[in-house]
Structure formats: structure tokens, C-alpha cells
């Protein structure tokens, strides 16, 4: 056997402490692998385990650091890209704003209008082509008809003349003349279809002017209303030009009407006749008609103003006992006459008016309702139904509603009694 000794293998001596340092140092010899034989090889492999773990840890740490650095470098690049995109958007908005600002120009408005027109046609709001043509033709015909009418000022003047003619209405001429005028108007209505042509309008206007000058007073009011309605219907029938034969017939009727009106008595003569009839009637009433003692005569009626006082119901009875009524007012003249009598004597006096049957609905004792034209005779703020006031009285310069159980003076009314000496 040889005396030389083989060096001992120290499997766990990979790391040795350097006495000059406080840390652990690696020596080159530690990385030299020594060949072992037999059971010593497994022990050497176990000695290299911690080194492998350390290497893996260093590799993982390095990978994490690299990833962080990459992200850090990417952030400025992303921010720069976003900034550039914002710049592009801002530029687009600026251009859009400038384009909108130019919309007010006439050319842009025209373009918009054309687009809207095309849109309307596309939506289907316009009628089909055949209907458009029909509508256009109707409008053309309407325009042509309107163009043939006389000018507005002349039509207005004609209407004013007819209004003045109506205002000139007075009383009834003799019956034969009335019948003749009525027949002429009837023929005129039947003959008229539509207005004559514009050239004839002036002639008709002149005829109406002469007719107005010749008219003194038209027939009585009831007949006048009928004639006015006929003239209104005649106006409604106005349209376009009638045929020549009908036009001739219209002129003939106007001529007859003018002749009939020309024979009427003038207005001054009619007024004189009316005045004479009024005077004659008054004289007859004074000579042949009498009111009872203590009664006052006015316009064909007799009035009794009491000197004592009663409530409203007893006043009604008192008038009935003498063949009269608690006064029922029929005209403004009668109201003025009675108001003057009561105001002179400074007496509150009952009249035959109440709303006993229905609150707010005033009615005379003869059953007739209070005319709306008489509402102006109430004193200011009356009737107010203060304290169940249902009966009307003369009070001062007007009417007042008062409680029916209050005692007042009263006024009776009855027609005058006329007689003949035998």
C-alpha cells in the first residue's frame, strides 16, 4: 500500500467564510466538480441544490425589473399618442364650428331649403302628380274668378249705400204701392243669378244711387225685415257673369223698381202726414176719452199714484179692484214719464215687477219677461237681492229691489175709456 493519502472530499464546503469580510464569498474552487465514485455521487448532487434556487430567484427578479422598465417607457408613448388624437378631434370640432357659422349665408339657406323640399317630397306629403295638376287648375280658375270681381273700394261703397238705404226706412206708403214694390223685389230676386260683368257694374251702381235719392221711407218694419233678408240672400247669390238674356232681365226689373219708388211721396210730406195723424189722435182722446178722477193720462193710458202705502202683494190687489194692474212698463217714454212722477214727489213706489217665481228672473204681473233693454234702469249695484229682496220699486232716478213685505206707495195702470155721445 502507498503511504500517500488522497485529499478528502468535503461536499458541504462549497461556501466558506472569508475572515476579512463579514459576508459570504464564493471561491473558484467551489465551482469545480470532483468526480466521485460509488455512494458519494448522490451526496454531491444534494450539495448543489441551494445554488440552483438562488440562480432561479435572480432570474425571476431580473424578469420583473425588465417588465417594469418596459411599462415605464410605454407610458410616455401612450400619453403622446392620446395627445395627438385630442389635437385631431379639436381640429375637427373647429372646422365643424366654422362650417356651422357659414350656414346663415344665403347660399347655404337655399341649399337647406332645397334639401327640405326634397325631404318633403320623399316623405310623401305631396299629393300625387295628377292631384297636383287638378289643384293647380282649381287655383288658376279661382284666381281668374277673383280677377273679374269689381275692386274692393267700389264694393264697399255699394254696401255703404245699401246700409244708408236701410237707415232711411220710415213708414208704410199706400198699400197698392207696397204691393208693387214687393212684387218688383220678388222679380228681381228671381231674375238675379250672379253679378254682371265689371263694365255693367258702374251702371248698376248709378241706378242704386238714384234709387237711394228717390227713396223717402220704405214699408213698415215687419215688411222691411223681409225685404232686407231678400237683399241679403241676393248678395249671397253673387258669383260670376250671368248670361246676356238674364242680364237684360235684371236691368228691366231695376227700371220697374226705380219707376215704382219714384212715385212714392217725398219724406217731408210723409212726416207732415204722420204729425197730423198724431195730433188728430191726441185731440180725439182728449175729446172722446176720459180717465177717472184722480188718474193721470199719458199716451192712451190712465195712471193712479196712490197716497197711501201697502206691501207689494196688497198693491197688486188694490189695482185689480179698480180694473187695473200694478204698472207694467212697455216703453222708454212710459218709463221716463213714471220716473219723473215718482222723483218729483220723492216717493218709493211699487211697480208690477218681481222675481218671486225664480230668483234672478224678473217678470211683470202680466206674465211678460223683463226686456234686456230695460236693464239700464236699475240703480247702480241693483238688483242685489240683499235680505231676500224680490219686488221692484221706483227709487230716486231708477229702480231698486226691495223686500215685498215693505209698505210703499203704488202705481196702477189701465187703458183710457173712450165713448161716443148718442
From Swiss-Prot:
A motif (Endocytosis signal) lies at residues 14-15. Residues 1-49 are cytoplasmic. Glycans are attached at residues 92, 384. Sequence repeats lie at residues 108-130, 131-151, 154-176, 177-199, 200-222, 223-245, 246-268, 269-291. Residues 71-422 are extracellular. PANTHER family: MANNOSE, PHOSPHOLIPASE, LECTIN RECEPTOR RELATED. Homotetramer. Probable pathogen-recognition receptor involved in peripheral immune surveillance in liver. May mediate the endocytosis of pathogens which are subsequently degraded in lysosomal compartments. Probably recognizes in a calcium-dependent manner high mannose N-linked oligosaccharides in a variety of pathogen antigens. Is a receptor for ICAM3, probably by binding to mannose-like carbohydrates. This is C-type lectin domain family 4 member M. It comes from Symphalangus syndactylus (Siamang).
Amino acid at each position: 500500500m502507498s503511504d500517500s493519502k488522497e485529499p478528502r472530499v468535503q461536499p458541504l464546503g462549497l461556501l466558506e467564510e472569508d475572515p476579512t469580510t463579514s459576508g459570504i464569498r464564493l471561491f473558484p474552487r467551489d465551482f469545480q466538480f470532483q468526480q466521485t465514485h460509488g455512494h458519494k455521487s448522490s451526496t454531491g448532487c444534494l450539495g448543489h441544490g441551494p445554488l440552483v434556487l438562488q440562480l432561479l430567484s435572480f432570474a425571476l427578479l431580473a424578469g420583473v425589473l425588465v417588465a417594469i422598465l418596459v411599462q415605464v417607457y410605454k407610458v410616455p408613448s401612450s400619453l403622446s399618442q392620446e395627445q395627438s388624437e385630442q389635437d385631431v378631434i379639436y381640429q375637427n370640432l373647429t372646422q365643424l364650428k366654422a362650417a356651422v357659422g357659414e350656414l346663415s349665408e344665403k347660399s347655404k339657406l337655399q341649399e337647406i331649403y332645397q334639401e327640405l323640399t326634397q325631404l318633403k317630397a320623399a316623405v310623401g306629403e305631396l299629393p300625387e302628380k295628377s292631384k297636383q295638376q287638378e289643384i293647380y287648375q282649381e287655383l288658376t280658375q279661382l284666381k281668374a274668378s277673383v280677377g273679374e270681381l269689381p275692386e274692393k273700394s267700389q264694393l264697399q261703397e255699394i254696401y255703404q249705400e245699401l246700409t244708408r238705404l236701410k237707415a232711411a226706412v220710415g213708414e208704410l206708403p199706400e198699400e197698392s204701392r207696397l204691393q208693387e214694390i214687393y212684387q218688383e223685389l220678388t222679380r228681381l230676386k228671381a231674375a238675379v243669378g250672379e253679378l254682371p260683368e265689371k263694365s255693367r257694374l258702374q251702371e248698376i251702381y248709378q241706378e242704386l244711387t238714384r234709387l237711394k235719392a228717390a227713396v223717402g221711407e220704405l214699408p213698415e218694419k215687419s215688411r222691411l225685415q223681409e225685404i232686407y233678408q231678400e237683399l241679403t240672400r241676393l248678395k249671397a247669390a253673387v258669383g260670376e257673369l250671368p248670361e246676356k238674356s238674364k242680364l237684360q232681365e235684371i236691368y228691366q226689373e231695376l227700371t220697374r223698381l226705380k219707376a215704382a219708388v219714384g212715385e212714392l211721396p217725398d219724406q217731408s210730406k210723409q212726416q207732415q202726414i204722420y204729425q197730423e195723424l198724431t195730433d188728430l189722435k191726441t185731440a180725439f182722446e182728449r175729446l172722446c176719452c176720459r180717465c177717472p178722477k184722480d188718474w193721470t193720462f199719458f199716451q192712451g193710458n190712465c195712471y193712479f199714484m196712490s197716497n197711501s202705502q201697502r206691501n207689494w202683494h196688497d198693491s197688486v190687489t188694490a189695482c185689480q179692484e179698480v180694473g187695473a194692474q200694478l204698472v207694467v212698463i212697455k216703453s222708454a217714454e212710459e218709463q221716463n214719464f213714471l220716473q219723473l212722477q215718482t222723483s218729483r214727489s220723492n216717493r218709493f213706489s211699487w211697480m208690477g215687477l218681481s222675481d218671486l217665481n225664480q230668483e234672478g228672473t224678473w217678470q211683470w204681473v202680466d206674465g211678460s219677461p223683463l226686456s234686456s233693454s230695460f236693464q239700464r234702469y236699475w240703480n247702480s249695484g241693483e238688483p242685489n237681492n240683499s235680505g231676500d229682496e224680490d219686488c221692484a220699486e221706483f227709487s230716486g232716478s231708477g229702480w231698486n229691489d226691495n223686500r215685498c213685505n215693505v209698505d210703499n206707495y203704488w202705481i196702477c195702470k189701465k187703458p183710457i175709456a173712450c165713448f161716443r155721445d148718442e
